[in-house]
UniProtKB/Swiss-Prot annotation:
MF terms in GO: DNA-binding transcription factor activity, RNA polymerase II-specific; RNA polymerase II transcription regulatory region sequence-specific DNA binding
Extent of Low complexity compositional bias: 60-69
Claim: DNA-binding is one of the keywords in the record: yes
Keyword tags: Developmental protein, DNA-binding, Homeobox, Nucleus, Transcription, Transcription regulation
Native source species: Pan troglodytes
Localization: Nucleus
UniProt superkingdom: Eukaryota
Any single biological process term in GO: regulation of transcription by RNA polymerase II
Name the record gives this protein: Homeobox protein Hox-D8
Primary role: Sequence-specific transcription factor which is part of a developmental regulatory system that provides cells with specific positional identities on the anterior-posterior axis.
DNA-binding stretch(es), residue numbering of this chain: 197-256
Keyword hit for Transcription regulation: yes
Amino acid sequence: MSSYFVNPLYSKYKAAAAAAAAAGEAINPTYYDCHFVPEVGGRHAAAAAALQLYGNSAAGFPHAPPQAHAHPHPSPPPSGTGCGGRDGRGQEYFHPGGGSPAAAYQAAPPPPPHPPPPPPPPPCGGIACHGEPAKFYGYDNLQRQPIFTTQQEAELVQYPDCKSSSGNIGEDPDHLNQSSSPSQMFPWMRPQAAPGRRRGRQTYSRFQTLELEKEFLFNPYLTRKRRIEVSHALALTERQVKIWFQNRRMKWKKENNKDKFPVSRQEVKDGETKKEAQELEEDRAEGLTN
């Protein structure tokens, strides 16, 4: 089909190549012989062979033999005979330059190889492979808000003598002041026994007060062993139990108008009976006057 276009170009190129060779000019090395592809050349060769074989009896048959149409892509004839038949005139007609179509196809340069695939990217080692961590999600870093407000800082600065913890009482105060800054202190971290300040009032629950009152009525003075037992039972310290009993004895003295607290339970009972007798006498005196 395309021989009408390829053959004139081929003849012109041959003439130009001969003229260039006579003038001493170099021919483009990228040129290759423009023969047909084996499939196209095979089609024309099969048609020429059929014409040679059935040429004498083709006039009596209106149609071509069915074998020619049964195979759309016939294989090329053997290399011993020509492409156009026994004398090879069909081959010379379609390929005047000589050589078989298979040889011309093999003489053509191979297509360039495909470029190798790019190597896989290295495994990601965290956020480092994505650039800056600040711009990882397209947002800037959030500004950290200060923990303390100006009012809280002012309150903490008022107590520079506070220590970082109550367990460092035996250490040097100068060393503690240098190691701990006021911005790291919280109100609940302040020790109870700070110098120059009054201690907060200790509050007792209803259950603790009731148990302490029972113990006081049983014995106003506690031994060391009993004080430890009471402090463990009520989840208090020995010092808190000791102070509570001291305050309770002072209260009893004020209520009974006595300078000395009774040592034994018998003295307590005697004092109560005397107090009841005095109250009865006062009531009788008021009744007589009325």
